[in-house]
């Protein structure tokens, strides 16, 4: 079985945190973040993560929100898609980002270390600086269907 067939499918976010080297966790989209991740066997992916407590726009028009509504919603979600490749031997996935709500991600390759256990997929980022210390992003997904 190749790596793509192992992870292909639809996944629901269970938890998302940044774990700092001191062991403390930060929840960038709250402790009850929601998300969807889809991998196809053809090598495409789509990922969306967001806070559950984002404020609704008062007038119901997404193009007419107040600056505060727009800021809270933008800071409360991430969405990106593109192609991907899997290296099962070394335990990582590369997301080739084609488009993202955060334009600085576009054209980048995002490495994620993965562990697949039953119907759970854990993705971890390489270490990065967060608030002056090393941290790792940890996302736990559950396969749907």
Predicted regions: what is each one?
Residues 1-145:
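Lipid interaction determinants
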């Amino acid at each position: 079985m190749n790596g793509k067939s192992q992870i292909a499918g639809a996944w629901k976010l269970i938890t998302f945190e940044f774990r700092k080297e001191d062991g403390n966790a930060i929840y960038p989209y709250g402790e009850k973040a929601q998300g969807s991740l889809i991998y196809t066997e053809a090598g495409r992916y789509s990922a969306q993560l967001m806070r559950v407590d984002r404020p609704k726009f008062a007038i119901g028009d997404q193009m007419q929100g107040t600056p505060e509504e727009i800021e809270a919603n933008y800071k409360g979600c991430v969405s990106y898609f593109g192609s991907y490749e899997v290296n099962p031997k070394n335990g990582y996935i590369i997301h080739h980002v084609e488009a993202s709500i955060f334009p600085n991600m576009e054209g980048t390759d995002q490495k994620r270390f993965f562990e697949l256990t039953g119907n759970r997929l854990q993705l971890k980022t390489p270490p990065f600086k967060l608030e002056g210390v090393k941290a790792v992003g940890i996302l736990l997904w559950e396969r749907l269907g």
